[in-house]
Amino acid sequence: MSPIDIAKNYIRAAQTGDQALLARTVSPTVVWHQPGSNRFSGTHQGLAAVGAMIGTMMEVSQGTFAITEAQHYMENGDWVAVSIHFGGEREGARLDQAGVDLLRIADGQVAEVFLFSSDPEQEDHFWGQ
């Protein structure tokens, strides 16, 4: 499977909530770099920690946080950049913006993730401290 195919499986699993596909696609030792200056920002180590973070994101967003579009998949060796659109809503705040997910593929799985947001201030406000 090519790095782009693996990236597409990751995005599909994230969009549909397919936990089995996510577990097959993301390395148990994934390193996740969450941008910004909010309660989720920083580096998270391992699938369990990332899963817990995403679970809390879903709680905060009342289940609305989602990748709504993934348009371009661009490969450079073991790296794949994906242009995305993501959003969510919670009482008093809305998240709606473009971003880039930069994925490092190793041994057929997503091994490292760097996320980029087009409006970091909006994202920080949405997630809070």
PLM ranges: what are they?
Residues 67-73, 85-87, 98-103, 114:
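Hydrophobic/aromatic beta-strand elements that line small-molecule binding cavities or substrate pockets
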Residues 26-27, 86-88, 117:
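Short beta-strand segments enriched in hydrophobic/aromatic residues
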Residues 1-29, 129:
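Short, low-complexity N-terminal intrinsically disordered segments enriched in polar/charged residues
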Residues 27-76:
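A solvent-exposed, acidic/Ser-Thr-rich amphipathic alpha-helical stretch
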